[in-house]
Swiss-Prot record:
<dbReference type="Pfam" id="PF04060">
    <property type="entry name" value="FeS"/>
</dbReference>
<dbReference type="GO" id="GO:0046872">
    <property type="term" value="F:metal ion binding"/>
</dbReference>
<keyword id="KW-0004">4Fe-4S</keyword>
<feature type="binding site">
    <location>
        <position position="57"/>
    </location>
    <ligand>
        <name>[4Fe-4S] cluster 1</name>
    </ligand>
</feature>
<feature type="binding site">
    <location>
        <position position="153"/>
    </location>
    <ligand>
        <name>[4Fe-4S] cluster 3</name>
    </ligand>
</feature>
<feature type="binding site">
    <location>
        <position position="49"/>
    </location>
    <ligand>
        <name>[4Fe-4S] cluster 1</name>
    </ligand>
</feature>
<feature type="domain" description="4Fe-4S ferredoxin-type 1">
    <location>
        <begin position="108"/>
        <end position="137"/>
    </location>
</feature>
<keyword id="KW-0479">Metal-binding</keyword>
<feature type="binding site">
    <location>
        <position position="127"/>
    </location>
    <ligand>
        <name>[4Fe-4S] cluster 3</name>
    </ligand>
</feature>
<feature type="binding site">
    <location>
        <position position="150"/>
    </location>
    <ligand>
        <name>[4Fe-4S] cluster 3</name>
    </ligand>
</feature>
<keyword id="KW-1278">Translocase</keyword>
<feature type="binding site">
    <location>
        <position position="74"/>
    </location>
    <ligand>
        <name>[4Fe-4S] cluster 1</name>
    </ligand>
</feature>
<feature type="binding site">
    <location>
        <position position="117"/>
    </location>
    <ligand>
        <name>[4Fe-4S] cluster 2</name>
    </ligand>
</feature>
<keyword id="KW-0677">Repeat</keyword>
<comment type="subunit">
    <text>The complex is composed of six subunits: RsxA, RsxB, RsxC, RsxD, RsxE and RsxG.</text>
</comment>
<feature type="domain" description="4Fe-4S ferredoxin-type 2">
    <location>
        <begin position="138"/>
        <end position="167"/>
    </location>
</feature>
<keyword id="KW-0472">Membrane</keyword>
Length: 192
């Protein structure tokens, strides 16, 4: 019985010692992130679609901050994201690159023609935001609330049954961009 307690104490002390060493090393050798990259990354839509030419939103944010990359290459974010980045960096806004040249681009979502879907799951694997649901050899469908319209699911489909359809804004589907609404603190008087 005595040897069990010795073993438990020895392992506990080893765990405590290694934890202290790891804690010290993580603080001593910590790499500080660029705060500008962090802010740009927060503004980007995090769809990781690659339409900007980078493998995800974080590498694009690093390229904007460190390499002077154009701020107008995020198609899913559109003009709103470009304007926020230009305001953050205090640079001139630029027209949106690529196919998103319109002033107010229409929101599009992927639509699957379920009669032609063979259930291969290639679209599910390609979707960066997990907006497509279905199982192998079963019908797939797109959850339109989650779809960013990034177009990454269209090309892998072997039966070409996926298309992008514009979504009309209705009072039910339209979402406020709360970050563009100015907020003021109004003093309130309390009367007894």
């Amino acid at each position: 019985m005595n040897t069990i307690w010795i073993a438990v104490a020895a392992i506990s002390l080893l765990g405590l010692a290694f934890g202290a060493i790891l804690g010290y090393a993580s603080r001593r050798f910590a790499v500080e992130d660029d705060p500008v990259v962090e802010k740009i990354d927060e503004i980007l839509p995090q769809s990781q679609c690659g339409q900007c030419g980078y493998p995800g939103c974080r590498p694009y944010a690093e390229a904007i901050s460190c390499n002077g990359e154009k701020i107008n290459r995020c198609a899913p974010g559109g003009e709103a994201v470009m304007l926020k980045i230009s305001e953050l960096l205090n640079v001139e806004p630029q027209p949106i690159d690529g196919e998103e040249q319109e002033l107010a681009p229409a929101r599009v979502v992927a639509v699957i023609d379920e009669n032609n879907c063979i259930g291969c799951t290639k679209c599910i694997q390609a979707c960066p935001v997990d907006a497509i649901v279905g199982a192998t050899r079963a019908m797939h469908t797109v959850m339109s609330d989650l779809c960013t319209g990034c177009n990454l699911c269209v090309d892998p489909c072997p039966t070409q049954c996926i298309s992008l359809q514009p979504v009309a804004e209705t009072p039910d589907s339209w979402k406020w961009d709360l970050n563009t609404i100015p907020v003021r603190i109004i003093p309130v008087e309390h009367h007894a």
